[in-house]
Amino acid sequence: MRLTGASPDGWGSISADRQFLKALREYCDRTGTQLIYDEVVTGFRLGLGGAKGYFVKPDLTVLGKIIGGGLPIGAICGRRDVMEHMDHTKYSGMEYFYHGGSFAGNPITLAAGLATINVLEHSPVYEHIAKLGNMARQDMSRIFEDADFPAQAVGVGSLFAIHLTNKKPLKDISDFISDLAQSKRRFNYLLENGIVILIPEMMHGAASYAHKEKDINYLTTCVENVKSRS
């Protein structure tokens, strides 16, 4: 089993290297190992196909969050020949796999999830949030470059992150975990001004369908103000 994320939001919104994913796929094929993607964050955020539509297809994918339409949910999906081992009409007992629980297949959650998929399929959600994500990254990058400030904005789709370093490319957590005290001061300033982003060590966030361009403009204004705080 190899569990990874193709576009790991929890790793500072730095996409996994394509050659790394390709090498993982080749290794798993060679050894008979299942390649599993953790798409609890990226699944349905980067597209209905998740991040697996960007790079290398996994054998299994773990999903959560938005697929429940705001209600608690978790899901596993994957290749038919792998998933059919959960079918007890074909494989009796617990010979291969057992799955069950008090909330498995909760009808209210599944109905909310289907309604969410319908909205994602028939509304310009992905175009809108990707546009805002690109806008946020480009505007913040311009601010940093114009001020010759050692920081960069990265991400994909609607995801964005701020890293207080000029080092490129970012490949390891040590590349962007910098002065924590400085990061906390800037994080707190943004929070005090209504900008909620995740953890000062890796300041990252995401645009939603409810956000507008004016919200991104406000974000970048706050970032421009915070860059000078030490």
Predicted features, each with a name:
Residues 1-230:
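Conserved N-terminal phosphate-binding loop of PLP-dependent enzymes in the Aspartate aminotransferase
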